[in-house]
């Protein structure tokens, strides 16, 4: 465990950070010799990192494995041994030069196939997502309609239960529950005379109180009202005509 931690620290510090800073200095100073040196190192270190991933799984049980890895990194980086330059010139550069065309073709094919695969997978993913959204919306609509239907049925049952429950009066006694509106209309339709009698038989509290108040108060004197004689129409004067007397002379002559 300790050797693994030490090897990781050596690889990170001496194998990655220090070469990165040296490459920065080479680019800044535009030193072609240093630039070529660190470019060869990074190519060799990339192959080392790829091989390390596999060997850590397969050969980690081997004795002094991590110590050998530390020594290899130092050998690559040391300016005395120049291990990275030796490996690049003897193994890496000849191999890449012989396989360069094949590697370029593989890279081009892989890029095209990966693009086509990505587009095909993307289309399938979009279709699946659209179908899933449609089915989820349909199921959700069905569930929502069922819930609304169940809620409406529950409300009706609750209203019926509330109508059936008796009410408790102020004296603690149970009173019958309120009659439904339809029942009251039916009762009124069956017995209209009874409803009218009950409405007319109730005394008006205002009239009772007013009569009692009038009985308590003393009667006030009222002035007698003089009767005005009616004006009779004037009687029409009748003219009396006296009868004419017969002349006495005429009688004597006869």
Swiss-Prot record:
Required for endoplasmic reticulum (ER) network formation, shaping and remodeling. May enhance the cell surface expression of odorant receptors. Residues 205-219 have a biased composition (Basic and acidic residues). The modification Phosphoserine is found at residue 152. The chain crosses the membrane at residues 1-21, 35-55. GO terms for molecular function: taste receptor binding. This is Receptor expression-enhancing protein 2. Interacts with odorant receptor proteins. It is a multi-pass membrane protein. Keywords: Membrane, Phosphoprotein, Transmembrane, Transmembrane helix. Residues 194-254 are annotated as: Disordered. GO terms for cellular component: cytoplasmic microtubule; endoplasmic reticulum; endoplasmic reticulum membrane; plasma membrane. It comes from Mus musculus (Mouse). The gene is Reep2. Belongs to the DP1 family. GO terms for biological process: endoplasmic reticulum tubular network organization; protein transport into membrane raft; regulation of intracellular transport; sensory perception of bitter taste; sensory perception of sweet taste. It is found in: Membrane.
């Amino acid at each position: 465990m300790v050797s693994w931690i030490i090897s990781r620290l050596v690889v990170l510090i001496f194998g990655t950070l220090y070469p990165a800073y040296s490459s920065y200095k080479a680019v800044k100073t535009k030193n072609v010799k240093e630039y070529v040196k660190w470019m060869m190192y990074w190519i060799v270190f990339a192959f080392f990192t790829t091989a390390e991933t596999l060997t850590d799984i397969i050969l980690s049980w081997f004795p002094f494995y991590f110590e050998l890895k530390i020594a290899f990194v130092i050998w690559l980086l040391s300016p005395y041994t120049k291990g990275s330059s030796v490996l690049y010139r003897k193994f890496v550069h000849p191999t890449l030069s012989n396989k360069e065309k094949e590697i370029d073709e593989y890279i081009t094919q892989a890029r095209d196939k990966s693009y086509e695969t990505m587009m095909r997978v993307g289309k399938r993913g979009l279709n699946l997502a659209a179908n899933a959204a449609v089915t989820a919306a349909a199921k959700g609509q069905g569930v929502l309609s069922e819930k609304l239907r169940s809620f409406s049925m529950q409300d009706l049952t609750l209203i019926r239960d509330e109508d059936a429950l008796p009410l408790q009066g102020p004296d603690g006694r149970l009173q019958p529950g309120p009659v439904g509106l339809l029942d009251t209309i039916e009762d009124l339709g069956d017995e209209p005379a009874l409803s009218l009698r009950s409405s007319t038989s109730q005394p008006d509290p205002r009239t009772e109180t007013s009569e009692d108040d009038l009985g308590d108060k003393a009667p006030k004197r009222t002035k007698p009202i003089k009767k005005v004689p009616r004006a009779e129409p004037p009687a029409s004067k009748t003219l009396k005509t006296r009868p004419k007397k017969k002349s006495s002379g005429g009688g004597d002559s006869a």
